[in-house]
């Protein structure tokens, strides 16, 4: 437990379930490749892993926004409003500047995940060897 609010991670999870119905985001996307899950280093191993790298970088940018200063270094703690229609995610225009930015980070990642092939061999990768 490193300060990540279950509610905000749960929102990202719901978003992924919107763009990829019947997916199990925690099981499938956590600890995948070099960037999916906590932390990240090296070169992404595939398209899905690259989605996670972009998402990590997006969160890094969020932390630098003046509107996100109160986040205490963790965008996962910010909850935002969004809706799902079919497989289409829409971030609410009621979000403040920081929420809107993080919502878009998550939305873009969820869309990216839905277009990327899933390679089971990249799940639980030996990141010390493969992501140096």
From Swiss-Prot:
Known cofactor(s): Ca(2+)
One GO-annotated biological process of the protein: phosphatidylcholine metabolic process
Reaction catalyzed: a 1,2-diacyl-sn-glycero-3-phosphocholine + H2O = a 1-acyl-sn-glycero-3-phosphocholine + a fatty acid + H(+); 1,2-ditetradecanoyl-sn-glycero-3-phosphocholine + H2O = 1-tetradecanoyl-sn-glycero-3-phosphocholine + tetradecanoate + H(+); 1,2-dihexadecanoyl-sn-glycero-3-phosphocholine + H2O = 1-hexadecanoyl-sn-glycero-3-phosphocholine + hexadecanoate + H(+); 1-hexadecanoyl-2-(9Z-octadecenoyl)-sn-glycero-3-phosphocholine + H2O = 1-hexadecanoyl-sn-glycero-3-phosphocholine + (9Z)-octadecenoate + H(+)
Cofactor binding, note field: Binds 1 Ca(2+) ion per subunit.
Keywords associated with the record: Autocatalytic cleavage, Calcium, Disulfide bond, Hydrolase, Lipid metabolism, Metal-binding, Phospholipid metabolism, Secreted, Zymogen
EC numbers: 3.1.1.4
Binding site for Ca(2+): 35, 37, 39, 56
Subcellular localization: Secreted
Residue stretch(es) of the prosequence: 1-7
Highest taxon above the source species: Eukaryota
Disulfide-bond pairs as recorded: 18-84, 34-131, 36-52, 51-112, 58-105, 68-98, 91-103
PROSITE patterns per UniProt: PA2_ASP, PA2_HIS
Positions of the catalytic residues: 55, 106
Function recorded in the entry: Secretory calcium-dependent phospholipase A2 that primarily targets dietary phospholipids in the intestinal tract. Hydrolyzes the ester bond of the fatty acyl group attached at sn-2 position of phospholipids (phospholipase A2 activity) with preference for phosphatidylethanolamines and phosphatidylglycerols over phosphatidylcholines. May play a role in the biosynthesis of N-acyl ethanolamines that regulate energy metabolism and inflammation in the intestinal tract.
Record protein name field: Phospholipase A2
